[in-house]
């Protein structure tokens, strides 16, 4: 094995880029870049029934959107291709034929029904279900008879008996498996397709992978892959298994869990920033030295240390993601925030596709008003709802504010001040509120809260004079009259 670090992300094109797969890609990418090595993307598409049209293209496009680039893949030949497993069948055949020739593998003619019966009988005896080895030493006559019955064989790897497979996991430390607990496993299906564990081991060797960094759900695959490496006398790469991502209930993140958005494309469509999502995902199961949590991609590459991958499950905290994204949104200039948010206002039918100069100025002021508190692009629709409503509804907290005894006096004074304004600007509105204070003697919350609630329906919000300006004199006076 050479000195250059070579790692891979190996997706199956079975759908869009999931947050968990994005994390696997991102950590492999950071590890390769931090070590001056190569990051390879290999498409594991042997299970044609599960492949989704457009799945491959979607995954690669959204990795690029996140800021993850690669050195070798289907679009960048580094001399170790093909990079799609479905195009490597001749390569796999050469290696499983070699195992058959050396009697390190054998043909198995058991039917699915026979295997299921065997499994059920083992469970009934409280035994660990595994293949009994029924076909492991067939005579030529027995094999000919099974072939004459029209049976199609699979190929099984002959698991060595009485051995212990040990590896030093980069995340979890030493892990060991007894081979006696692993039955002879299928490496080629009856239709001639290599299984996952066989194809992966062959590819990782031929593509000169030095480190395999993946989710802990692959731990049980590792001894099988190591046995295949050993059978050929190949160097075994270093393995590291990252902990699961869990939701707020500490349950494994499941694609069926609809309370959490789980696909990168959905975050992109909602107006999350790729740099922020990269930052957030990089902290899912990895931590830097110190308290800082916001880093550029280049900074992550400089500080990434595989030894700081967490041994505990990574909590997917939606509030944290919104906070991280908000920090990045706050760093944008107004033109960038408008580009991020305006399409969402247009899609929601709040503003038209073609804006007059006057309307464009109004929209830019509206977006600027919420710039600091915006968590993601699409949130602008919800935040600005009060500017597009004819009628506003008051919740219980708002009703309690409006029921205070000073409110009629404050509202009457404020309406009078607004009607006298010739110029409806934030400065003039601020002066009008001060005049109400002088006229009524009410100040602080007794003054500002009723005005805010009356015109916005909310007890909290952005700068009040700017909000009143954008609502417009007519709307504000109508709302005051309605209470």
From Swiss-Prot:
Location in the cell: Cytoplasm
Motif annotated as 'HIGH' region, chain positions: 11-21
Record note on cofactor: Binds 1 zinc ion per subunit.
Residues at which ATP binds: 255
Reaction catalysed by this enzyme: tRNA(Glu) + L-glutamate + ATP = L-glutamyl-tRNA(Glu) + AMP + diphosphate
Biological processes annotated in GO: glutamyl-tRNA aminoacylation
This protein's GO CC annotations: cytosol
UniProt-annotated binding residues for Zn(2+): 108, 110, 135, 137
Renumbered ranges of motif 'KMSKS' region: 252-256
Keyword Cytoplasm: yes
The EC number(s) this enzyme carries: 6.1.1.17
Sorted UniProt keywords: Aminoacyl-tRNA synthetase, ATP-binding, Cytoplasm, Ligase, Metal-binding, Nucleotide-binding, Protein biosynthesis, Zinc
GO molecular function, one term: tRNA binding
Cofactor: Zn(2+)
Record-linked PANTHER family: GLUTAMATE--TRNA LIGASE, GLUTAMATE--TRNA LIGASE, MITOCHONDRIAL-RELATED
NCBIfam families to which the protein is assigned, alphabetical: gltX_bact
Self-association and partners: Monomer.
Family according to the record: Belongs to the class-I aminoacyl-tRNA synthetase family. Glutamate--tRNA ligase type 1 subfamily.
Name of the featured protein: Glutamate--tRNA ligase
Organism this protein belongs to: Bacillus pumilus (strain SAFR-032)
